[in-house]
Amino acid sequence: KINLEGPIVKDKTSFNISARRSYADLIAKPFMPDDEKYSYYFYDINAKINHKFSDRSRLYLSAYNGKDHFAADYDSNTDYKDGSKMNWGNTIISARWNYIFNNRLFSNTTVSYNNYLFDINAYTSNQYALGNDETFTNRYSSDYRSGINDWNYQIDFDYNPSPVHHVKFGTGYIYHRFRPEVMTSKISDRTDDQTYRDTTYHNMNNSRIYAHEVSAYAEDNLKISSRLRLNLGLHFSLFHVQKQSYFSLQPRISARYQLTDDITLKASYTKMSQYVHLLSSMPIAMPTDLWVPVTKEIKPMQSHQYSLGGYYTGIKGWEFSVEGYYKDMRNVLEYKDGVSFFGSSTGWENKVEMGKGRSVGIELMAQKTLGKTTGWLSYTLSKSDRKFAKGGINNGERFP
């Protein structure tokens, strides 16, 4: 790991650059058999520049690039070889301008670009001796890619009109470019001096999906009395894709009431809409998970979440809490039974179903905040399930 930081212009401009790379692949390489090679590594690079125009105006520039790589190759002899490799990573570039209008109002204006891509490649190669010292080679390879590009503009305001109000509001715009899935296969037959076949097949639609997302929000953290606080908010969003527009109003409300000096109660309700779905092809998180947008056929996911909690601070140096929640979801997206993103020329929209979901849970926590030893201990019990139309996934029965 490397970290460099320092001033560019004294009391005005500074920089910070850090980079790291794992080295397990370099350590393991000498111990691998000659006919099998495995490699895994990751790296990330962060760079920041901060500039102070004045006491009221500051600019923050940042860039990030990270990548994970996995490869496996098998070479039993000179006649047969096969292997695969997987790469996934993110690139983020952003500029944030912070401006203080007065002691009650300040703003943050952010412009950013984000690129996510994963790529899986597999190949097999066979060689045959034809005589006269000539070799015939047959090679097959397949490549699967998925990615997202986002261009984002956001402006946020923080306003304190009085001691009992803390208001936040803002608006934003995102231009999305999705490539949900692109699969390419290539077959070649050749000798040392002649090519008999060199063909590329595009098994899936290579088209991109473009979308525009506009949002605006406002919230007020309101002090009703010395014991009661309310947070009231409303979020508006509009998503336009494939000549189809979706919009949503999403209220949020939370209340915090201090029952006694030691006991505080909290309750909240949140409605949310999500225009980008995560399609998981495996029961654990993998880079093969696809981020796909809503379309004319795929509707936005909507959820309503309710929570209730209590907090106790009656023992010096300790905090105890219990919190429960319930979340109801609509238009949840899952792959149909027996379907994944591999091995089919069918587009992703034809391989998924929309259904319902729910999630419920409770969390207990004890936290020590004073003394030479501090820390926390928590326990969470939760359950989540899905339900699809009869005859669909799991024959319409609920499943985790």
Show where each model-derived region lies.
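Transmembrane beta-barrel wall of Gram-negative outer-membrane proteins
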Residues: 1-23, 34-69, 85-109, 113, ...
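Repeated loop/turn-to-beta-strand initiation elements of outer-membrane beta-barrel proteins
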Residues: 12-15, 56-59, 101-107, 117, ...
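Transmembrane beta-barrel strands of outer-membrane/channel proteins
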Residues: 17-23, 61-67, 109-115, 169-175, ...
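Extracellular loop and loop/strand-boundary signature of outer-membrane beta-barrel proteins
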Residues: 31-36, 77-84, 92-96, 136-144, ...
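Surface-exposed extracellular loop regions of Gram-negative outer-membrane beta-barrel proteins
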Residues: 69-71, 117, 184, 257, ...
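Signature of Gram-negative outer-membrane beta-barrel scaffolds
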Residues: 166-264, 275-276, 391-394
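Gram-negative outer-membrane beta-barrel transporters
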Residues: 326-328, 346-400
